[in-house]
Amino acid sequence: RSSYAFVTDPLPREVLGKLGHTLVWESARPYLYLRSTQEGRLLIGGEDDDEDIAERRDARVMEKARTLAAKVEALWPDLEINPTFCWGGTFAETDDGLPYFGPHESLGPRVHFAMAYGGNGITYSMIGAQLLRALIEGREHPLGALFSLQREPSMASTRR
């Protein structure tokens, strides 16, 4: 599977409005996410598809960026969105839709993983960073079992 994203040039504070210092995850299928950066850019992504051949994925990047920009403009009609840097990437996902964070029992406690974000790396990266930091510091994290590589299959694994 592949996902697509782009970043805008820095936008003036008055143009960004309430989107400054925020993260939005619109969960329709295909989903849309955006977040602002410290310098006033918008990072926008989504438009996942089943493409796993890099050349074909890369040929779709501009079309996907235009589609994402149009979706953001439909949600916030006062914004004019122009992709500055665009990219696509292949991703992995688990049966239950949650990423894996932490050690694998067969590799010992000093090898940690952060993987299978299912195209939601922007959303899950902060949780993963906090969880891995706690593990490295020898602390338990309240979400550790939920994202463990040794977790039990859940009802969510029947989501498809």
Report residues per predicted region.
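C-terminal catalytic lobe of FAD-dependent flavoproteins
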Residues: 50-58, 70-160
